Amino acid sequence: MIKLGAQYFTIRDYCQTVEDFDASCKKVSEIGYKYIQLSGIGDFSADEIKPIIDKYGLKVVCTHRPPKNYLDNLENEIKFHKTLDFKICGVGSMPYFYEMEDRSEAIEEFVKNFKPVVQRLKEEGLVFAYHNHAIEFERINGKHTFDTLVEKMSSDNFKFILDVYWLAFAGIDPAKFILKNKDDIACVHFKDLKVVENTAKYAEVGVGNLVWEEIISACKEADVEFALVEQDDFWNNNNPFESLVISYDFLKKRGL
């Protein structure tokens, strides 16, 4: 059964102090979410986070942590994830990829630096997960970066946080892609794509053009454990918590 959660990047502006994080967790819990992904929040310790999420009955299931944390302070990252008692150690994008002129060189740099990280996390019973955008579906030397990463990392402990918005943005059918790559999925980001004045915008689940019946069905068939609602910004200037409510209500009506 798919477990529905909230990606805290959606409410990052309301999570920069411990007090605001506490208030936001209360609101998220009151909406009905029980699972969360930590991303974009203030630089809090696991010991600061744990009593707050416990108070509101929330369970962390995934992170987006700065890539340098894994490279410079891996043992601290292991402790952080274990203190909060979850396995999916995520990064939001590939460092260097947007900065380096030679994208193939950026991939090689990422693989070289993160292969030992992936192996060390595996030794500790943790999973490394990479979040896609559209850029992973550019063709470099005739191959999508996504496929190149899977091939070069060559580890059953290298997984993906699949973002269905960015799949659709890249011209990829999310449902078919989920089924094709089911063994490489750590969790899935649910956000919709709405066209506003000929421009793709992030939108609440069910408000845009993605075919959610197909996506949800594919996630079930692929045994996806966590679907995490995310919205990077707000096409209609909604309060982020209002957007989380809209997505939650839509998905709950569809059995999640």
Regions found by a protein language model. Give the residues of each.
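Short strand-loop junctions, especially beta-strand C-caps/beta-turns
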Residues: 9-11, 65, 94, 133-135, ...
